[in-house]
Amino acid sequence: ATGWYPGTGNHGTGRQGIVCFKLDPMTGEILSDKKIISHGSGGKCPEGPHLYKKDGWYYLMLAEGGTEFGHMETIGPSRTIDGPYEFCPNGPILTARDDNGNGSPIQCTGHADIVDDANGNWWIVSLGTRPIGPMAHHLGRETFLAQLDWVDGWPVVRNGGLMQLEAEGDLPQADTVKPVSDDLHCDF
């Protein structure tokens, strides 16, 4: 069995990019040359690549723009794993930068991942901050979750690409595990 690993680096080009190479998942042995497959959508510091395969397309999702108030998540499809990737013409799929996020309680969104659940719903999980004033967020980066829809082959984060503090969603219900005993003895 083999796998593909996406990572970051400039590999002698002098320009940050996303590299991909084949590897043996059991040994970690690199089985192919490292190839730059993207320089991102144009935002600074493309990093945190994730590769997905859906409906015969490979999707490369990146964090771009740095981790503060310019942070964003971009995505592009390709028919082959090594590109070329054409990024979403509607801009980042997730961001609170510029006019899109003015007044949003959650800022600096990015470094995301997309998953589908057992019910076939799609979700995006992302880092973000809750500012307490201009350029200040005392809780650091937190994790947020939002629903995502696929529209004409593109992932679209609900609420205009903004995370919300509260949202409705059809989450699968887990069985509740009852405690074996509730006779805890404390003597301190």
Tell what function each PLM region has.
Residues A1-F188:
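Carbohydrate-active catalytic/glycan-binding domains of CAZyme proteins
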